[in-house]
């Protein structure tokens, strides 16, 4: 068995069965089962769902959506990612699988917005996300480090 890696999940009946394992493990707001059922098209490769398989079973998952212009008070302009419903099965928690999912999103090099749920603020703090409080709730933002060696269009010949 190879080292687990993050992969885009196909929207199909196998994934639907895998999602059922998460039902009852977490809070209702983390449930993706209904979202998957509503969008089921066999083997849709444009799925917003990403996960980690271990031993042939899905053990961790998240939703990742590309958005534009977070505006005030989000401190995000342009394209950014919304990371939702990150969940790791209880048996596999505290083994780095949640961090693997977040690092996968980070390597795309877009700002990331997420909502900390179920006493997870320490997790997001550890991964260099910054808390932002607004009147309708709290969330966390991560900004990619800017590469000072990058050449912009204005600087190129």
From Swiss-Prot:
This is Uncharacterized N-acetyltransferase BcerKBAB4_3748. Transmembrane segments: none annotated. GO terms for molecular function: acyltransferase activity, transferring groups other than amino-acyl groups. Residues 9-154 form the N-acetyltransferase domain. CDD domains: NAT_SF (cd04301). Keywords: Acyltransferase, Transferase. It holds the Pfam family Acetyltransf_1. It comes from the Bacteria. Its EC number is 2.3.1.-. InterPro entries: Acyl_CoA_acyltransferase, GNAT_dom, YlbP.
């Amino acid at each position: 068995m190879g080292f687990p890696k993050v992969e885009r999940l196909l929207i199909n009946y196998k994934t639907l069965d895998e999602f059922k394992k998460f039902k009852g493990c977490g809070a209702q707001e983390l449930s993706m089962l209904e979202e998957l059922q509503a969008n089921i098209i066999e083997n849709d490769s444009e799925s917003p769902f990403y996960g980690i398989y271990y031993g042939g079973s899905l053990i961790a998952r998240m939703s990742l959506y590309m958005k534009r212009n977070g505006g005030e008070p989000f401190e995000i302009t342009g394209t950014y990612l919304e990371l939702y419903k990150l969940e790791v099965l209880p048996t596999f928690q505290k083994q780095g699988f949640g961090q693997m999912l977040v690092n996968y999103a980070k390597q795309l090099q877009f700002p990331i917005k997420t909502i900390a749920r179920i006493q997870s603020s320490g997790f997001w703090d550890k991964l260099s996300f910054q808390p932002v409080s607004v009147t309708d709730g709290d969330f966390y933002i991560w900004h990619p480090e800017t590469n000072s060696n990058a050449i912009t269009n204005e600087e190129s010949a």
